[in-house]
Each structure stands twice: as C-alpha cells, then as structure tokens.
C-alpha cells in the first residue's frame, strides 16, 4: 500500500488548460407551431487538471460562454376569447406571424467539474473527460430579428368583422421587439470533452479537441405568456414545454504544466 501511494504521488501531473471553444447551440423543445433553429456557441475556458495516476485524474474550472439560438414561424394562431371582453361578446384572437424569426442570446458563467482519463505517448496525449457543469446566466435576451407579428380580433356569426391596429385593446402590428427572457438562475448540464495534446520540446503543449453538453433542467423559469398578447420570448410562451440547451463544437488551446510529482517545476515540461 505504501509503495502504491508513493508511486501515485510521483505520477501526479498538475496543469492549467486554457481553451477557446466554438460550435453550435441547439435548444431542444417541441413548440405547438413553428420550429427552433440552431445558433452559435462561443466560450473561453480555464480549467485546473490533476492526474493522480498515469491514466486517471480530475478537473475543475470556469467557463464564460455566449450562446445564441433562433425560432422561426410563418403561421396564424387562432385563440377563442370567451371570457368577459371589452367588446362584451366573445371573439377569436388571431395572431399572425409573417416570416417571423426570434433570436435568443445568453451570456453565462459555468463551473465544470469532471473526471478524466488519458492515454499518454511521447508526443501526443489523448484525454477524454465527463462531468457536470453548474451555470449562472448573467444576461438572457431575445429580439424579433425578422418579419412581423400582428394581432387581430375576429367577430363571427352575424357580425363577421375583423378589427386590427387598436393598440389600447391589444391589437397591434409589430416588426421589432426585444426584452429579457425569464430564465432559470441555475443551469445544470452534463458535459463530455476529448482532446489531443501535442507536445513540442517537452514544454509547449497545444491541444485540439471537441466538446458536448446536454442540459438537465428547464432553461427558462415559466411558460405562461400568450404569444400575441404578452410581448415575451417564445421560450416563455404557452407554445413551448421544457427547453433543453445542447451544445457541440471544437476546442483549441494550451496547457500550462504546474508540477509533476514532488521534484518538478513549471519549467520542466511534460516528460
């Protein structure tokens, strides 16, 4: 046992990984109408890694991420209004989306913690890891980036009339709108990444790899806004259910060695 512990101590590698990541974000949900479209994912990551043995270790760090996604619709929603109304009689609210696109953007800080395995060789180390990320959104915004949304009131039966462009009664045509997304302040996700670390002259490690993350909880805090009445993001509307963010992409960066065992300094490289 003492011999094993001694070998474990001598095998330890400590390093700081700094990566720039870029890829695609997909918001997974099934709206009643329209369809989500992918956006972009860009992040900067700084992670401490320690390999307790030659092949296994752990990592913990911090990410700063900027994510975008889109929602597209070109349809008409008809909602019966049967409660007491300003007109005194029931009517049908028509919400007309004409080539409409909503863009969602979020900026968040995440803390990944995971387990890592590596297969070392003289010039290349292959490393793969899995873990959990805890995220805190700093900003979450939406804007109508294309098309228009218009609300009209249709009175059927003997009246057979349609009213529009009466903003004081919620009937309007709008080409632009922007605001905050009511987002959950705690974002949890599973992540996996892999990288090839290329070593030159023992101490200049460049890594290249890929990453994937999958959200565990609903991205937003509510789904109670009626599109066309409340000027909210589609993500907070009654047209959507659970919103799950998915990110996939590539990463490129450097690793800074800190120490190897008890006799290694920052200048001693990787072998």
Map each language-model feature to its residues.
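N-terminal signal peptide c-region/cleavage motif recognized by signal peptidases
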Residues: 6-8
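Outer-membrane beta-barrel channels and translocator barrels
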Residues: 13, 51-53, 120-124, 199-203, ...
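Start-of-domain marker
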Residues: 13-61, 65
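Transmembrane beta-strands of outer-membrane beta-barrel proteins
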Residues: 16-20, 58-62, 109-111, 126-134, ...
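Transmembrane beta-strands of outer-membrane beta-barrel pores
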Residues: 22-28, 64-68, 107, 132-140, ...
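Extracellular/periplasm-exposed beta-strand and loop segments of Gram-negative cell-envelope proteins
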Residues: 28-38, 67-106, 137-187, 219-228, ...
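Transmembrane beta-barrel domains of outer membrane proteins
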Residues: 47-49, 114-118, 195-197, 251-255
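Outer-membrane beta-barrel "beta-signal"
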Residues: 244-271
